[in-house]
């Protein structure tokens, strides 16, 4: 697992509270990604990875995204 993904998962776990729910989050359609799953956005390339990271960090530190 790369460091960027590791940090995202750490933040998600802190917000969501369970590894199982973090795994579900990655595979669930998300309105912030035009109903695409975060995993699909992540897998689309560097821009997708940055988009997912920005979303999670905004939710963690800057309020709801």
Residue ranges and their predicted role:
Residues 1-65:
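Non-transmembrane "mature" sequence context
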């Amino acid at each position: 697992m790369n460091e960027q993904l590791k940090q995202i998962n750490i933040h998600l776990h802190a917000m969501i509270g369970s590894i199982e729910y973090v795994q579900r989050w990655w595979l669930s359609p998300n309105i912030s990604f035009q109903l695409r799953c975060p995993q699909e956005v992540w897998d689309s390339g560097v821009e997708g990875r940055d988009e997912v990271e920005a979303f999670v960090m905004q939710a963690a530190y800057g309020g709801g995204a």
